[in-house]
């Protein structure tokens, strides 16, 4: 396994193999080129890195723990399961790792206004949080469907001073919110910084977001070394756009002994038209500035994604994931809504931790695999966020089940 094979970049054009790139309107091209230049300069600037480390430690609360899930391990009766506790970060998810990095870059570039898209609302909350901390006005684009199912996060964003713009186009979900945010950016290129929440979008976003999230994997390596004296045997993380997964995976891509599993949202099943599994049920195409795997119909039109989890409800996936899928370094599987809900309840009851429905997809895959593995197998699951935001969804689901019973 060589560096050039699994951690190739991206190259100067933002490509991971044939995926990624910069498919943007002419008006945006100077902006993304400028952003790439500024990001490269920031990465090489010790002052920027020092400031980033300060906020990671004192504002986000890093490092967060790598926790041995003893009762879940006993319940499964196989592999030793560890949780990387991203839900303990300030704002309750991994999203803030990226937001703090990007807001420091926006500040460095002299931008006066932040915009962002959000699905589950966690990236919106994290963006509104850093906007408040740095005194910047902030506009969040959110699909009307997602606003409906994520009322608590909408209120949190408003409390933090953000303006929320409901998007009714299409299915009123993340894809549509991202379209609107891109339109805003084209119109306000001079003073506005677009804070993309996942490893998608035009170059340099996929690489930049991955880099800001890669602290997850770096901490995991050091923490497991301290606890067990060795590398993990497997890593499991949920994948929508895929930033928590890339954050965990990137550190280990060149370690051939580490098996890496990305978990897509299988919705009602990948054999139906109600899922969000782009790699297991999609084909390559271009969306939101990059070439990747997408859910599309025979005419190449983007089809609607479905997942019980608003954060995985996206018809594409980050281009680096598409590349890692094609070169077979990472195995991508899917978990249904029902399997994710079962894992959600099991984690609540066994560990006293209420996980996000997104993270519950990764937990479900871990629960499936662990019993078949030896007791000395070390498995790390990324607990990407907490489940407070999902209470209404779970309550509705339980009420519907009781009616059927």
Swiss-Prot record:
It holds the Pfam family PALP. The modification N6-(pyridoxal phosphate)lysine is found at residue 95. One of its GO terms (molecular function) is tryptophan synthase activity. Pathway: Amino-acid biosynthesis; L-tryptophan biosynthesis; L-tryptophan from chorismate: step 5/5. Its EC number is 4.2.1.20. It is an enzyme of class 4 (lyase). It comes from the Bacteria. Keywords: Amino-acid biosynthesis, Aromatic amino acid biosynthesis, Lyase, Pyridoxal phosphate, Tryptophan biosynthesis. It catalyses: (1S,2R)-1-C-(indol-3-yl)glycerol 3-phosphate + L-serine = D-glyceraldehyde 3-phosphate + L-tryptophan + H2O. PANTHER family: TRYPTOPHAN SYNTHASE, TRYPTOPHAN SYNTHASE-RELATED. The beta subunit is responsible for the synthesis of L-tryptophan from indole and L-serine. Belongs to the TrpB family. This is Tryptophan synthase beta chain. It comes from Pseudomonas putida (Arthrobacter siderocapsulatus). The lineage of its organism: Bacteria, Pseudomonadati, Pseudomonadota, Gammaproteobacteria, Pseudomonadales. The gene is trpB.
């Amino acid at each position: 396994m060589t560096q050039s094979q699994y951690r190739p970049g991206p190259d100067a054009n933002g490509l991971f193999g044939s995926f990624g790139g910069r498919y943007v309107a002419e008006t945006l091209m100077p902006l993304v080129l400028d952003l790439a230049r500024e990001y490269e300069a920031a990465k090489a600037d010790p002052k920027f890195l020092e400031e980033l480390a300060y906020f990671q430690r004192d504002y986000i609360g890093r490092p967060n723990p790598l926790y041995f899930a003893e009762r879940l391990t006993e319940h499964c009766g196989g592999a030793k399961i560890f949780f990387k506790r991203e839900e303990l970060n300030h704002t309750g998810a991994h999203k803030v790792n990226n937001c703090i990095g990007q807001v420091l870059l926006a500040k460095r570039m002299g931008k006066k206004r932040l915009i962002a898209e959000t699905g589950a609302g966690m990236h919106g909350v994290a963006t509104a949080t850093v906007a408040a901390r740095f005194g910047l006005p902030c506009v969040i684009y959110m699909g009307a469907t997602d606003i409906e199912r994520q009322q608590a996060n909408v209120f949190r964003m408003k409390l933090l001073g953000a303006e929320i713009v409901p998007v009714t186009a299409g299915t009123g979900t993340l894809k549509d919110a991202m379209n609107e945010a891109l339109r805003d950016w084209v119109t306000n290129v001079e003073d506005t910084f677009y804070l993309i929440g996942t490893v998608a979008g035009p170059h340099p976003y996929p690489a930049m977001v991955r880099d800001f999230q890669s602290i997850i994997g770096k901490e995991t390596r050091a923490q497991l070394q301290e606890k067990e004296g060795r590398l993990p045997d497997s890593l499991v993380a949920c994948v929508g756009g895929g930033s928590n997964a890339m954050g965990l995976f990137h550190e280990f891509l060149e370690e051939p002994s580490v098996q890496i599993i990305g978990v897509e949202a299988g919705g009602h099943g990948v054999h139906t038209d109600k899922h969000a599994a782009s790699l297991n049920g999609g084909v390559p195409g271009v969306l939101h500035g990059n070439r990747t795997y997408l859910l599309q119909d025979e005419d190449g039109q983007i089809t609607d994604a479905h997942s019980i989890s608003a954060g995985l409800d996206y018809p594409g996936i980050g281009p680096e994931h598409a590349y890692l899928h094609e070169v077979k370094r990472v195995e991508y599987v899917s978990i249904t809504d029902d399997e994710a809900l079962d894992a959600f309840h099991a984690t609540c009851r066994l560990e006293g931790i209420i996980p996000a429905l997104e993270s519950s997809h990764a937990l479900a895959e871990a629960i499936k695999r662990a019993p078949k593995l030896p007791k000395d197998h070390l498995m790390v699951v990324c607990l990407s966020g907490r489940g407070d935001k999902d209470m209404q969804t779970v309550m509705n689901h339980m009420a519907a089940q009781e009616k059927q019973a």
